[in-house]
Amino acid sequence: MLDTVTLSPDIDALMNDIGRKAKAAARPLGFASTEAKNRALNAMADAILANSAHILAENAKDLKDVEGSEMLASFIDRLTLSDKRIAEMAEGIRAIAALADPVGEVIAAWDRPNGLKIERVRTPLGVIGVIFESRPNVTADAGALCLKAGNAVILRCGSDSRRSSQAIHACMVDGLKAARLPEHAIQLVPVTDRAAVGAMLRGLDGSIDVIVPRGGKSLVARVQSEARVPVFAHLEGLCHIYVDASADIEMAKKIVVNAKMRRTGICGAAETLLVDGAAIGTHLTPLLDVLTEAGCEIRGSAAVLKVAPGIKPATEEDWTTEYLDAIISVAVVDGISGAIAHIQTYSSNHTEAVIAEDPAVVERFFTEVDSAILLHNASTQFADGGEFGMGAEIGIATGKMHARGPVGVEQLTSFKYRVRGAGQTRP
Protein backbone atom coordinates (compact mmCIF):
# COMPACT_ATOMS: atom_id res chain seq x y z
CA MET A 1 0.00 0.00 0.00
CA LEU A 2 1.10 3.61 -0.55
CA ASP A 3 2.33 5.76 2.29
CA THR A 4 0.05 8.63 3.22
CA VAL A 5 0.68 11.62 0.97
CA THR A 6 0.11 14.93 2.72
CA LEU A 7 0.38 18.16 0.74
CA SER A 8 -0.80 20.44 3.55
CA PRO A 9 -0.19 20.37 7.31
CA ASP A 10 -3.78 21.53 7.79
CA ILE A 11 -6.18 19.10 6.15
CA ASP A 12 -9.25 21.05 7.20
CA ALA A 13 -7.91 24.24 5.62
CA LEU A 14 -7.02 22.39 2.43
CA MET A 15 -10.39 20.69 2.20
CA ASN A 16 -12.37 23.84 2.98
CA ASP A 17 -10.49 25.59 0.18
CA ILE A 18 -11.44 22.76 -2.18
CA GLY A 19 -15.03 23.12 -1.02
CA ARG A 20 -15.08 26.86 -1.66
CA LYS A 21 -13.68 26.37 -5.15
CA ALA A 22 -16.27 23.68 -5.89
CA LYS A 23 -19.11 25.87 -4.67
CA ALA A 24 -17.87 28.76 -6.80
CA ALA A 25 -17.66 26.48 -9.84
CA ALA A 26 -21.15 25.09 -9.23
CA ARG A 27 -22.79 28.48 -9.69
CA PRO A 28 -21.98 28.98 -13.40
CA LEU A 29 -22.40 25.26 -14.04
CA GLY A 30 -26.01 25.54 -12.91
CA PHE A 31 -26.88 27.53 -16.00
CA ALA A 32 -24.13 26.36 -18.40
CA SER A 33 -25.48 25.49 -21.83
CA THR A 34 -26.10 21.91 -22.83
CA GLU A 35 -23.76 22.45 -25.78
CA ALA A 36 -20.89 23.54 -23.52
CA LYS A 37 -21.36 20.60 -21.16
CA ASN A 38 -21.50 18.13 -24.04
CA ARG A 39 -18.42 19.68 -25.65
CA ALA A 40 -16.55 19.20 -22.38
CA LEU A 41 -17.72 15.60 -22.03
CA ASN A 42 -16.69 14.63 -25.55
CA ALA A 43 -13.32 16.32 -25.05
CA MET A 44 -12.89 14.29 -21.84
CA ALA A 45 -13.57 11.06 -23.74
CA ASP A 46 -11.06 12.08 -26.42
CA ALA A 47 -8.43 12.87 -23.79
CA ILE A 48 -8.91 9.54 -22.03
CA LEU A 49 -8.41 7.62 -25.27
CA ALA A 50 -5.42 9.78 -26.27
CA ASN A 51 -3.80 9.21 -22.87
CA SER A 52 -4.71 5.53 -22.48
CA ALA A 53 -1.07 4.40 -22.44
CA HIS A 54 -0.28 6.79 -19.59
CA ILE A 55 -3.41 5.78 -17.67
CA LEU A 56 -2.49 2.09 -18.02
CA ALA A 57 1.09 2.78 -16.91
CA GLU A 58 -0.14 4.57 -13.79
CA ASN A 59 -2.63 1.77 -13.15
CA ALA A 60 0.19 -0.77 -13.37
CA LYS A 61 1.98 1.13 -10.59
CA ASP A 62 -1.15 1.02 -8.43
CA LEU A 63 -1.46 -2.71 -9.03
CA LYS A 64 2.21 -3.26 -8.17
CA ASP A 65 1.68 -1.53 -4.83
CA VAL A 66 -0.92 -4.11 -3.80
CA GLU A 67 1.08 -7.12 -5.02
CA GLY A 68 1.48 -9.67 -2.27
CA SER A 69 -1.28 -8.14 -0.19
CA GLU A 70 -4.27 -10.10 1.01
CA MET A 71 -6.71 -8.13 -1.11
CA LEU A 72 -9.65 -10.11 -2.50
CA ALA A 73 -9.71 -10.97 -6.18
CA SER A 74 -12.80 -8.76 -6.48
CA PHE A 75 -10.78 -5.80 -5.14
CA ILE A 76 -8.01 -6.36 -7.67
CA ASP A 77 -10.59 -6.71 -10.45
CA ARG A 78 -12.15 -3.35 -9.60
CA LEU A 79 -8.72 -1.70 -9.46
CA THR A 80 -7.52 -3.14 -12.76
CA LEU A 81 -7.83 -1.16 -15.98
CA SER A 82 -7.31 -2.47 -19.52
CA ASP A 83 -7.59 -1.15 -23.06
CA LYS A 84 -11.14 -2.49 -23.14
CA ARG A 85 -12.12 -0.85 -19.85
CA ILE A 86 -10.60 2.46 -20.87
CA ALA A 87 -12.51 2.33 -24.16
CA GLU A 88 -15.68 1.57 -22.19
CA MET A 89 -14.91 4.50 -19.89
CA ALA A 90 -14.70 6.88 -22.84
CA GLU A 91 -17.80 5.35 -24.41
CA GLY A 92 -19.67 5.84 -21.14
CA ILE A 93 -18.78 9.53 -21.08
CA ARG A 94 -20.00 9.94 -24.66
CA ALA A 95 -23.22 8.16 -23.71
CA ILE A 96 -23.72 10.70 -20.92
CA ALA A 97 -23.14 13.51 -23.40
CA ALA A 98 -25.86 11.99 -25.61
CA LEU A 99 -28.41 12.02 -22.78
CA ALA A 100 -31.04 14.72 -22.53
CA ASP A 101 -29.96 17.58 -20.27
CA PRO A 102 -32.08 17.33 -17.11
CA VAL A 103 -31.39 20.90 -15.97
CA GLY A 104 -34.34 23.15 -16.70
CA GLU A 105 -36.68 20.28 -17.55
CA VAL A 106 -40.27 21.02 -16.58
CA ILE A 107 -41.32 18.00 -14.52
CA ALA A 108 -44.89 19.14 -13.98
CA ALA A 109 -47.03 22.17 -14.74
CA TRP A 110 -50.52 23.26 -13.72
CA ASP A 111 -52.77 26.29 -13.54
CA ARG A 112 -54.55 27.44 -10.39
CA PRO A 113 -58.11 28.81 -10.35
CA ASN A 114 -56.71 32.23 -9.46
CA GLY A 115 -54.70 32.29 -12.69
CA LEU A 116 -51.28 31.43 -11.24
CA LYS A 117 -49.24 29.19 -13.54
CA ILE A 118 -46.97 26.82 -11.61
CA GLU A 119 -44.05 24.75 -12.94
CA ARG A 120 -41.80 22.27 -11.14
CA VAL A 121 -38.37 22.49 -12.81
CA ARG A 122 -35.20 20.40 -12.40
CA THR A 123 -32.17 22.16 -10.92
CA PRO A 124 -28.67 20.94 -10.00
CA LEU A 125 -28.02 19.75 -6.46
CA GLY A 126 -24.88 21.88 -6.21
CA VAL A 127 -21.69 20.16 -5.00
CA ILE A 128 -21.44 16.37 -4.80
CA GLY A 129 -18.78 14.67 -2.69
CA VAL A 130 -17.75 11.22 -3.92
CA ILE A 131 -15.59 8.98 -1.72
CA PHE A 132 -14.42 5.77 -3.38
CA GLU A 133 -12.01 2.85 -3.07
CA SER A 134 -10.20 0.82 -5.73
CA ARG A 135 -12.44 2.02 -8.57
CA PRO A 136 -10.48 4.45 -10.78
CA ASN A 137 -13.32 4.44 -13.33
CA VAL A 138 -15.45 6.31 -10.76
CA THR A 139 -13.30 9.37 -11.49
CA ALA A 140 -14.68 9.44 -15.02
CA ASP A 141 -18.22 8.24 -14.30
CA ALA A 142 -18.86 10.56 -11.37
CA GLY A 143 -17.18 13.54 -12.98
CA ALA A 144 -19.18 13.16 -16.19
CA LEU A 145 -22.53 12.54 -14.51
CA CYS A 146 -22.17 15.46 -12.12
CA LEU A 147 -21.15 17.80 -14.94
CA LYS A 148 -24.10 16.80 -17.12
CA ALA A 149 -26.45 17.50 -14.20
CA GLY A 150 -24.84 20.91 -13.64
CA ASN A 151 -23.07 19.94 -10.41
CA ALA A 152 -19.51 20.41 -9.24
CA VAL A 153 -17.90 17.30 -7.75
CA ILE A 154 -15.15 16.64 -5.21
CA LEU A 155 -13.60 13.19 -5.67
CA ARG A 156 -11.66 11.45 -2.93
CA CYS A 157 -10.09 8.18 -4.09
CA GLY A 158 -8.41 5.53 -1.97
CA SER A 159 -4.62 5.35 -1.83
CA ASP A 160 -4.78 2.11 -3.81
CA SER A 161 -6.15 3.85 -6.93
CA ARG A 162 -4.41 7.22 -6.50
CA ARG A 163 -2.18 7.18 -9.57
CA SER A 164 -4.85 5.82 -11.91
CA SER A 165 -7.40 8.34 -10.65
CA GLN A 166 -4.97 11.24 -11.04
CA ALA A 167 -4.28 10.28 -14.65
CA ILE A 168 -7.99 10.08 -15.44
CA HIS A 169 -8.73 13.30 -13.55
CA ALA A 170 -6.19 15.18 -15.67
CA CYS A 171 -8.20 14.15 -18.74
CA MET A 172 -11.42 15.39 -17.14
CA VAL A 173 -9.82 18.79 -16.45
CA ASP A 174 -8.61 18.94 -20.07
CA GLY A 175 -12.23 18.52 -21.15
CA LEU A 176 -13.40 21.34 -18.90
CA LYS A 177 -10.70 23.63 -20.30
CA ALA A 178 -11.66 22.75 -23.87
CA ALA A 179 -15.22 23.91 -23.21
CA ARG A 180 -14.13 26.91 -21.11
CA LEU A 181 -15.99 25.62 -18.09
CA PRO A 182 -14.65 26.12 -14.53
CA GLU A 183 -11.64 23.86 -13.93
CA HIS A 184 -12.66 23.40 -10.30
CA ALA A 185 -15.93 21.79 -11.37
CA ILE A 186 -14.20 18.40 -11.04
CA GLN A 187 -11.60 18.24 -8.27
CA LEU A 188 -9.62 15.27 -6.99
CA VAL A 189 -8.53 15.52 -3.36
CA PRO A 190 -4.69 15.60 -3.51
CA VAL A 191 -4.13 13.79 -0.20
CA THR A 192 -4.77 10.25 0.98
CA ASP A 193 -4.91 11.22 4.65
CA ARG A 194 -8.15 9.83 6.06
CA ALA A 195 -8.79 13.14 7.77
CA ALA A 196 -9.86 14.37 4.33
CA VAL A 197 -12.77 11.93 4.43
CA GLY A 198 -13.83 13.24 7.82
CA ALA A 199 -13.72 16.80 6.53
CA MET A 200 -15.94 15.87 3.58
CA LEU A 201 -18.42 14.12 5.86
CA ARG A 202 -18.70 17.34 7.87
CA GLY A 203 -19.71 19.11 4.66
CA LEU A 204 -16.68 21.39 4.14
CA ASP A 205 -18.23 24.34 5.90
CA GLY A 206 -21.51 24.04 4.03
CA SER A 207 -20.02 23.48 0.58
CA ILE A 208 -21.07 19.85 0.01
CA ASP A 209 -24.75 19.14 -0.66
CA VAL A 210 -24.66 15.33 -1.02
CA ILE A 211 -22.12 12.56 -0.29
CA VAL A 212 -21.88 9.39 -2.39
CA PRO A 213 -19.63 6.57 -1.08
CA ARG A 214 -18.40 3.87 -3.45
CA GLY A 215 -16.52 1.17 -1.59
CA GLY A 216 -16.59 -1.60 0.96
CA LYS A 217 -19.00 -2.08 3.80
CA SER A 218 -16.77 -0.37 6.37
CA LEU A 219 -16.43 2.79 4.26
CA VAL A 220 -20.15 3.02 3.54
CA ALA A 221 -21.02 2.35 7.19
CA ARG A 222 -18.67 5.12 8.31
CA VAL A 223 -20.16 7.56 5.81
CA GLN A 224 -23.72 6.74 6.82
CA SER A 225 -22.84 7.05 10.50
CA GLU A 226 -20.77 10.25 10.42
CA ALA A 227 -22.08 12.30 7.50
CA ARG A 228 -23.73 15.60 8.34
CA VAL A 229 -25.08 15.96 4.81
CA PRO A 230 -27.46 13.68 2.86
CA VAL A 231 -26.00 10.39 1.59
CA PHE A 232 -26.83 8.35 -1.52
CA ALA A 233 -25.54 4.83 -0.81
CA HIS A 234 -26.05 1.14 -0.30
CA LEU A 235 -24.30 -0.76 2.47
CA GLU A 236 -23.88 -3.99 0.50
CA GLY A 237 -25.42 -5.96 -2.34
CA LEU A 238 -27.07 -9.06 -0.87
CA CYS A 239 -28.87 -9.91 -4.11
CA HIS A 240 -31.27 -12.86 -4.39
CA ILE A 241 -32.65 -14.94 -7.25
CA TYR A 242 -35.85 -16.90 -6.73
CA VAL A 243 -36.51 -19.75 -9.17
CA ASP A 244 -40.19 -20.66 -9.15
CA ALA A 245 -41.61 -24.06 -10.10
CA SER A 246 -43.09 -22.39 -13.18
CA ALA A 247 -39.65 -21.24 -14.40
CA ASP A 248 -38.20 -22.47 -17.69
CA ILE A 249 -35.23 -24.48 -16.44
CA GLU A 250 -32.95 -23.69 -19.39
CA MET A 251 -33.60 -19.99 -18.95
CA ALA A 252 -33.08 -20.31 -15.20
CA LYS A 253 -29.70 -22.02 -15.62
CA LYS A 254 -28.45 -19.34 -17.99
CA ILE A 255 -29.63 -16.46 -15.80
CA VAL A 256 -28.35 -17.91 -12.51
CA VAL A 257 -24.84 -18.54 -13.87
CA ASN A 258 -24.66 -15.07 -15.38
CA ALA A 259 -26.00 -13.39 -12.23
CA LYS A 260 -23.37 -15.10 -10.07
CA MET A 261 -20.36 -15.64 -12.31
CA ARG A 262 -20.23 -12.90 -14.98
CA ARG A 263 -18.44 -10.61 -12.53
CA THR A 264 -18.45 -11.89 -8.98
CA GLY A 265 -17.04 -8.72 -7.43
CA ILE A 266 -19.79 -6.24 -8.31
CA CYS A 267 -22.68 -5.23 -6.08
CA GLY A 268 -25.22 -6.66 -8.54
CA ALA A 269 -23.80 -10.19 -8.36
CA ALA A 270 -26.25 -12.73 -6.94
CA GLU A 271 -25.26 -14.03 -3.50
CA THR A 272 -28.26 -16.26 -2.70
CA LEU A 273 -30.30 -18.63 -4.86
CA LEU A 274 -33.77 -19.58 -3.63
CA VAL A 275 -35.48 -22.57 -5.25
CA ASP A 276 -39.18 -23.36 -4.99
CA GLY A 277 -39.74 -26.48 -2.89
CA ALA A 278 -42.20 -27.67 -5.53
CA ALA A 279 -39.32 -27.74 -8.03
CA ILE A 280 -36.77 -29.78 -6.07
CA GLY A 281 -37.11 -32.74 -8.41
CA THR A 282 -36.94 -30.73 -11.63
CA HIS A 283 -34.93 -27.55 -11.04
CA LEU A 284 -32.59 -27.88 -8.06
CA THR A 285 -30.07 -30.44 -9.34
CA PRO A 286 -29.66 -28.85 -12.80
CA LEU A 287 -29.04 -25.48 -11.16
CA LEU A 288 -26.48 -26.91 -8.74
CA ASP A 289 -24.76 -28.74 -11.59
CA VAL A 290 -24.47 -25.71 -13.85
CA LEU A 291 -23.09 -23.56 -11.02
CA THR A 292 -20.53 -26.22 -10.12
CA GLU A 293 -19.47 -26.53 -13.76
CA ALA A 294 -18.97 -22.77 -13.85
CA GLY A 295 -16.55 -23.01 -10.91
CA CYS A 296 -18.87 -21.71 -8.21
CA GLU A 297 -18.70 -22.98 -4.63
CA ILE A 298 -22.15 -23.81 -3.24
CA ARG A 299 -23.26 -23.54 0.37
CA GLY A 300 -26.61 -25.19 0.86
CA SER A 301 -29.44 -25.33 3.37
CA ALA A 302 -30.47 -28.63 4.97
CA ALA A 303 -33.00 -29.29 2.21
CA VAL A 304 -30.34 -28.72 -0.44
CA LEU A 305 -27.92 -31.08 1.33
CA LYS A 306 -30.49 -33.87 1.12
CA VAL A 307 -30.30 -33.63 -2.66
CA ALA A 308 -26.57 -32.89 -2.87
CA PRO A 309 -24.91 -34.16 0.33
CA GLY A 310 -21.41 -33.38 -0.94
CA ILE A 311 -21.74 -29.61 -0.84
CA LYS A 312 -20.79 -27.36 2.05
CA PRO A 313 -23.56 -26.66 4.60
CA ALA A 314 -24.71 -23.04 4.78
CA THR A 315 -24.51 -21.29 8.15
CA GLU A 316 -26.65 -18.41 9.37
CA GLU A 317 -23.75 -16.10 8.51
CA ASP A 318 -23.86 -17.18 4.86
CA TRP A 319 -27.31 -15.68 4.36
CA THR A 320 -25.95 -12.27 5.40
CA THR A 321 -22.64 -12.42 3.53
CA GLU A 322 -21.84 -10.46 0.39
CA TYR A 323 -19.22 -12.87 -0.97
CA LEU A 324 -18.01 -10.84 -3.96
CA ASP A 325 -16.49 -14.14 -5.01
CA ALA A 326 -17.40 -17.38 -6.79
CA ILE A 327 -19.55 -18.55 -3.87
CA ILE A 328 -23.33 -18.73 -3.59
CA SER A 329 -25.75 -19.74 -0.85
CA VAL A 330 -28.66 -21.93 -1.93
CA ALA A 331 -31.90 -22.57 -0.04
CA VAL A 332 -35.16 -24.35 -0.76
CA VAL A 333 -38.21 -22.22 0.09
CA ASP A 334 -41.94 -22.76 0.30
CA GLY A 335 -42.93 -21.12 -2.98
CA ILE A 336 -43.22 -17.40 -3.50
CA SER A 337 -44.31 -16.86 0.13
CA GLY A 338 -41.13 -18.50 1.39
CA ALA A 339 -38.99 -16.57 -1.07
CA ILE A 340 -40.46 -13.24 -0.01
CA ALA A 341 -40.04 -14.12 3.68
CA HIS A 342 -36.37 -15.05 3.15
CA ILE A 343 -35.67 -11.87 1.18
CA GLN A 344 -37.40 -9.70 3.78
CA THR A 345 -35.23 -11.28 6.47
CA TYR A 346 -31.82 -11.11 4.79
CA SER A 347 -31.92 -8.67 1.88
CA SER A 348 -29.98 -5.40 1.79
CA ASN A 349 -32.75 -4.02 -0.45
CA HIS A 350 -30.43 -3.72 -3.44
CA THR A 351 -31.53 -6.07 -6.25
CA GLU A 352 -33.67 -9.21 -6.42
CA ALA A 353 -34.79 -11.35 -9.36
CA VAL A 354 -37.63 -13.80 -9.93
CA ILE A 355 -37.51 -16.45 -12.64
CA ALA A 356 -41.04 -17.61 -13.33
CA GLU A 357 -43.67 -18.03 -16.04
CA ASP A 358 -46.63 -17.71 -13.68
CA PRO A 359 -47.87 -14.08 -13.90
CA ALA A 360 -49.39 -14.25 -10.42
CA VAL A 361 -46.00 -15.17 -8.93
CA VAL A 362 -44.27 -12.34 -10.77
CA GLU A 363 -46.91 -9.78 -9.76
CA ARG A 364 -46.70 -10.79 -6.11
CA PHE A 365 -42.89 -10.62 -6.18
CA PHE A 366 -42.97 -7.14 -7.71
CA THR A 367 -45.62 -5.96 -5.25
CA GLU A 368 -44.29 -7.36 -1.99
CA VAL A 369 -40.50 -7.29 -2.32
CA ASP A 370 -39.23 -3.87 -1.24
CA SER A 371 -35.82 -3.59 -2.89
CA ALA A 372 -34.54 -0.80 -5.11
CA ILE A 373 -34.35 -2.98 -8.24
CA LEU A 374 -36.57 -5.96 -9.10
CA LEU A 375 -36.11 -8.09 -12.21
CA HIS A 376 -38.23 -10.75 -13.90
CA ASN A 377 -36.50 -13.39 -16.03
CA ALA A 378 -33.28 -11.38 -16.18
CA SER A 379 -29.88 -11.39 -14.47
CA THR A 380 -29.25 -9.30 -11.36
CA GLN A 381 -26.12 -8.02 -13.12
CA PHE A 382 -28.36 -5.64 -15.07
CA ALA A 383 -28.47 -3.56 -11.86
CA ASP A 384 -26.37 -0.87 -13.44
CA GLY A 385 -27.00 2.68 -14.60
CA GLY A 386 -25.44 2.03 -17.99
CA GLU A 387 -27.72 -0.96 -18.55
CA PHE A 388 -30.67 1.21 -17.53
CA GLY A 389 -29.85 3.65 -20.31
CA MET A 390 -28.48 6.27 -17.90
CA GLY A 391 -25.07 6.36 -19.61
CA ALA A 392 -23.44 5.45 -16.29
CA GLU A 393 -24.19 5.70 -12.60
CA ILE A 394 -22.57 7.41 -9.67
CA GLY A 395 -23.76 4.55 -7.45
CA ILE A 396 -26.76 2.50 -6.37
CA ALA A 397 -28.95 3.95 -3.63
CA THR A 398 -31.09 1.69 -1.46
CA GLY A 399 -32.59 4.38 0.74
CA LYS A 400 -36.03 5.82 0.14
CA MET A 401 -35.31 9.54 0.21
CA HIS A 402 -34.76 11.35 -3.10
CA ALA A 403 -32.75 8.77 -5.08
CA ARG A 404 -33.27 5.01 -5.23
CA GLY A 405 -31.66 2.45 -7.52
CA PRO A 406 -29.02 3.57 -10.04
CA VAL A 407 -28.12 7.21 -9.45
CA GLY A 408 -27.82 8.87 -12.86
CA VAL A 409 -28.12 12.43 -14.12
CA GLU A 410 -31.78 12.87 -13.19
CA GLN A 411 -31.17 11.65 -9.64
CA LEU A 412 -28.37 14.24 -9.33
CA THR A 413 -30.89 17.06 -9.61
CA SER A 414 -33.38 18.67 -7.27
CA PHE A 415 -36.19 20.99 -8.33
CA LYS A 416 -37.65 24.40 -7.78
CA TYR A 417 -41.05 25.93 -8.42
CA ARG A 418 -41.59 28.73 -10.90
CA VAL A 419 -44.86 30.57 -10.37
CA ARG A 420 -46.07 33.10 -12.95
CA GLY A 421 -48.75 35.59 -12.08
CA ALA A 422 -50.49 38.65 -13.47
CA GLY A 423 -50.76 40.82 -10.40
CA GLN A 424 -52.49 38.33 -8.06
CA THR A 425 -52.51 39.05 -4.33
CA ARG A 426 -53.58 36.61 -1.64
CA PRO A 427 -56.90 37.45 0.04
Curated annotation (Swiss-Prot):
Purpose of the protein: Catalyzes the NADPH-dependent reduction of L-glutamate 5-phosphate into L-glutamate 5-semialdehyde and phosphate. The product spontaneously undergoes cyclization to form 1-pyrroline-5-carboxylate.
Protein name from the UniProt record: Gamma-glutamyl phosphate reductase
Keyword Lipid metabolism carried by entry: no
Subcellular location: Cytoplasm
GO cellular component: cytoplasm
Alphabetized UniProt keyword annotations: Amino-acid biosynthesis, Cytoplasm, NADP, Oxidoreductase, Proline biosynthesis
Organism: Rhizobium etli (strain CIAT 652)
Pfam families: Aldedh (PF00171)
GO molecular function annotation: glutamate-5-semialdehyde dehydrogenase activity; NADP binding
EC number: 1.2.1.41
Keyword rRNA processing: no
Catalytic activities: L-glutamate 5-semialdehyde + phosphate + NADP(+) = L-glutamyl 5-phosphate + NADPH + H(+)
HAMAP family, A to Z: ProA
One record GO biological process: L-proline biosynthetic process
PROSITE patterns documented for this protein: PROA
Annotated gene: proA
Principal place of residence: cytoplasm
Biological pathway: Amino-acid biosynthesis; L-proline biosynthesis; L-glutamate 5-semialdehyde from L-glutamate: step 2/2
Family to which the UniProt record says this protein belongs: Belongs to the gamma-glutamyl phosphate reductase family.
